[in-house]
Amino acid sequence: IPPRQDAANAPFLLLLNGDKLVPLNLSWAILLANFMDRLEPFAGLEISESDWRAMAASAVAETRKTYPFTPKAQLAGDLELMLTSLVAIARGQEPAVEVGALSLGDYAAEMTAPHRMDLMLSAMRRSGAWHCNQKCLHCYAAGQTLGETPELTTDQWKSLLEKLRRANIPQVTFTGGEPTLRPDLPELVEAAQWFVTRLNTNGRLLTPELC
């Protein structure tokens, strides 16, 4: 996530697994973005060692267009070090490089957009009737002002997801109501592959096939 253009000394921000904030300098942010662009077509697929090497080499070549005087070997080493460190951070281990502490509150003033957007896929009420597959004694979503707002169509949600992506909002939460009541939920999750995606659900309709 890039900082505001007038925040010259602010780092880029990587949101890792939705709960870890990792600051990146400009060169590493460009290198990682180029690698992620090449990784995206493999979403949900097994990546062979040769594919991995090809993606890394392509990301390095693309980054050299910005840093033409930086040796390929140095960029390749930086990419390997960065990815190894990110895996360690994701696993709660000590990374190979020093990573400064960063809180969302401290970084908020440098951001160009929110770090998360909650999307109410399913309304709490339809035509005045309760629209959920449970009737809990307490529901945090019940009685809210917009609880009966008409639901967007699949195409409208996809269009919104694209707008959120262009705005550099890295995380979306599918919520409701009960989002699993929508038959297009898998399609919307697939459309949200670019994001860190969360699902707020009571779990009643979750099956191994749906998961």
What is each of the regions a protein language model found here?
Residues 67, 77-81, 85, 95-210:
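Conserved alpha-helical substructure of the radical SAM core
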Residues 1, 15, 30, 47, ...:
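Weak global preference for isoleucine
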Residues 20, 24-119:
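Long, charge-rich, low-complexity alpha-helical segments
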Residues 3-30:
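Short alpha-helical segments that sit at the start of domains
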